[in-house]
């Protein structure tokens, strides 16, 4: 299985090139790039007000207001410090870098810029991991509508943090492959007792979402992660956040890869069968052609 990159490579490569050229004393060039990411996220890299010595990185998330309620602004201020500026129009967060005043730790700054989406997501997880660590119960469940028709729920108890993703399967085939995929997660936990518990429910929401407006339907699935203190403590939480916030994309990416592989194998098998059929086809009988005198025509 393939782990999706947590960082955004386009941001990192663009900034790294800008920093490298600036350090070499090269004339700065204009940049204007708009590109998308998973979950409807949109990025914009540009020169604000046409100033080529400044590079702005902006991100737009449809669900950013919900993240703000869980401390997203405070976390980003802690991580990015003075690089965090007022967001440009149409975006939620903007970072500004001055090519005439390069930071000493360029690699670290570039990497953190590439982690912008992850760091926006991280606030809700850090908040509930902290609740669990402090033994708090009864806090309201976090509800993040991270896609138009899909939702993430986070809830903490004294001994665990429960994260539930709802997801929509577009085809019946996706449901079948998704079930097989989730079964592999269950099998994997038997081999590693330190892995979190993973549950999958189809059509109906899990008990954790009882008495909520969680969606119900034949194409609806719910993936539940039960995270214990060994997954949420200070030394492990960063890696946990890296992995869990991309899980929905990870699942659907592998469903698509599985379908593509199956189709490729089907085409290969069809081609093999056609070759066998062509070899088995009998040759057409050659009719002997004779003249009126009884002589036989011979082909030249």
Swiss-Prot record:
Subunit structure: Component of the Arp2/3 complex composed of ACTR2/ARP2, ACTR3/ARP3, ARPC1B/p41-ARC, ARPC2/p34-ARC, ARPC3/p21-ARC, ARPC4/p20-ARC and ARPC5/p16-ARC. Interacts with SHANK3; the interaction probably mediates the association of SHANK3 with the Arp2/3 complex. Interacts with DNAI3; this interaction reduces binding of the Arp2/3 complex to the VCA domain of nucleation promoting factors.
Name of the protein: Actin-related protein 2/3 complex subunit 2
GO biological process: actin filament polymerization; Arp2/3 complex-mediated actin nucleation; positive regulation of actin filament polymerization; positive regulation of lamellipodium assembly; positive regulation of substrate adhesion-dependent cell spreading
Single GO MF annotation: structural constituent of cytoskeleton
Subcellular location: Cytoplasm, Cytoskeleton; Cell projection; Synapse, Synaptosome; Nucleus
Any Pfam family hit: P34-Arc
Major localization class: cytoplasm
KW Nucleus (keyword) present: yes
PANTHER family: ACTIN-RELATED PROTEIN 2_3 COMPLEX SUBUNIT 2 (PTHR12058:SF0), ARP2/3 COMPLEX 34 KDA SUBUNIT (PTHR12058)
Similarity section: Belongs to the ARPC2 family.
Function: Actin-binding component of the Arp2/3 complex, a multiprotein complex that mediates actin polymerization upon stimulation by nucleation-promoting factor (NPF). The Arp2/3 complex mediates the formation of branched actin networks in the cytoplasm, providing the force for cell motility. Seems to contact the mother actin filament. In addition to its role in the cytoplasmic cytoskeleton, the Arp2/3 complex also promotes actin polymerization in the nucleus, thereby regulating gene transcription and repair of damaged DNA.
Modified residues (N6-acetyllysine): 275, 295
Keyword terms of this UniProt record: Acetylation, Actin-binding, Cell projection, Cytoplasm, Cytoskeleton, Nucleus, Synapse, Synaptosome
GO cellular component: Arp2/3 protein complex; cytosol; endosome; focal adhesion; glutamatergic synapse; lamellipodium; muscle cell projection membrane; neuron projection
């Amino acid at each position: 299985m393939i782990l999706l990159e947590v960082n955004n490579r386009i941001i990192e490569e663009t900034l790294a090139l800008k920093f490298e050229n600036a350090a070499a004393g090269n004339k700065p060039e204009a940049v204007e790039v708009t590109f998308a990411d998973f979950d409807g996220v949109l990025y914009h890299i540009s020169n604000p007000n046409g100033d080529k010595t400044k590079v702005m990185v902006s991100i737009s998330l449809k669900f950013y207001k919900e993240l703000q309620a869980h401390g997203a602004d405070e976390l980003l201020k802690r991580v990015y410090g003075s690089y965090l500026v007022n967001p440009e129009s149409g975006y939620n967060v903007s970072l500004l870098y001055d090519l005439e005043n390069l930071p000493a730790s360029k690699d670290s700054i570039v990497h953190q810029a590439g982690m912008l989406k992850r760091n926006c997501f991280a606030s809700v997880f850090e908040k509930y991991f902290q609740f669990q660590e402090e033994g708090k119960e009864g806090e309201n469940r976090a509800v993040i509508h991270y896609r138009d028709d899909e939702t993430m729920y986070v809830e903490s108890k004294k001994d665990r943090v429960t994260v539930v993703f709802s997801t929509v399967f577009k085809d019946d085939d996706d449901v079948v492959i998704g079930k097989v995929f989730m079964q592999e997660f269950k099998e994997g936990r038997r081999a590693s007792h330190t892995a979190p518990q993973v549950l999958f429910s189809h059509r109906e929401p899990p008990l954790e979402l009882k008495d909520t407006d969680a969606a119900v339907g034949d194409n609806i699935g719910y993936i539940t992660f039960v995270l214990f203190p060994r997954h949420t403590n200070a030394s492990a939480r960063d890696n946990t956040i890296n992995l869990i916030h991309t899980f929905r994309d990870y699942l659907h990416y592998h469903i698509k890869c599985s379908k593509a592989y199956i189709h490729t194998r089907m085409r290969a098998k069809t081609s093999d069968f056609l070759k066998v059929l062509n070899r088995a086809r009998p040759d057409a009988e050659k009719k002997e052609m004779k003249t009126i005198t009884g002589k036989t025509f011979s082909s030249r």
